[in-house]
């Protein structure tokens, strides 16, 4: 995930500093660690934020600014988005992601829960089936793409008997993220968020809660913490982008690493909008022509 970025001037030192802040060896975890090591949510979350911010800082060095852009991040990616939009510092973003990951890992250990993607089917029927099984639509990513979360036994029943014209794919997550199962992680995460110095956004920052721009730094931080137990409404973020793009002279979508999933959604939901998935420094070339 991080190997190509560490070849950039200053990147290794930056990551070393973030490793100290997070209490994790992000350099090793992002280069030579096994897949099993980095699937631990306590590791994955700060690693994802670090990867995003390394790429963004390189883009900034090349003269690009987030000002006058729209910024959004999915789930833990929202923390990185807050740093890109100037609400928190990059250092605090990594620290906050590490706390979030550690607290959520503890919550996941309380009882066996998980997540599964429900692809296709009628939305109303899918939601009704989830409710009947006491599952939560934890991520509503796009039309025909809802992520269910809850007890493992209920997810097994969903997979055995999916909604009509839908298929279920279990996800390799540690637990039922963005549901009430994460409630025990709230206090520790909230305390960490309250200790962070904030500034007003320098770019339009969309919230996972409702897809709308945050009103202020205080509003942003309140929503960020609350999002731990609430569904990610990426579908609403996409709807806001669609509305904004209709009146824009030019528009394009850039997804920072680890990239690919959100660009894939954009290609389906925002047809005709140029996109770029940034996976290595070379992908930053030519963004002016996007």
Curated annotation (Swiss-Prot):
The protein's Enzyme Commission number: 2.3.1.39
Gene Ontology BP term (one): fatty acid biosynthetic process
Keywords: Acyltransferase, Fatty acid biosynthesis, Fatty acid metabolism, Isopeptide bond, Lipid biosynthesis, Lipid metabolism, Transferase, Ubl conjugation
Active site annotation, chain numbering: 75, 178
Cross-link entry Isoglutamyl lysine isopeptide (Lys-Gln) (interchain with Q-Cter in protein Pup), positions: 157
Reaction catalyzed: holo-[ACP] + malonyl-CoA = malonyl-[ACP] + CoA
Record GO terms (molecular function): [acyl-carrier-protein] S-malonyltransferase activity
Listed InterPro entries: Ac_transferase_dom_sf, Acyl_transferase_dom, Acyl_Trfase/lysoPLipase, Mal-CoA-ACP_Trans/PKS_FabD, Malonyl_transacylase_ACP-bd
Homology family: Belongs to the FabD family.
Protein name per Swiss-Prot or TrEMBL: Malonyl CoA-acyl carrier protein transacylase
Species name: Mycolicibacterium smegmatis (strain ATCC 700084 / mc(2)155)
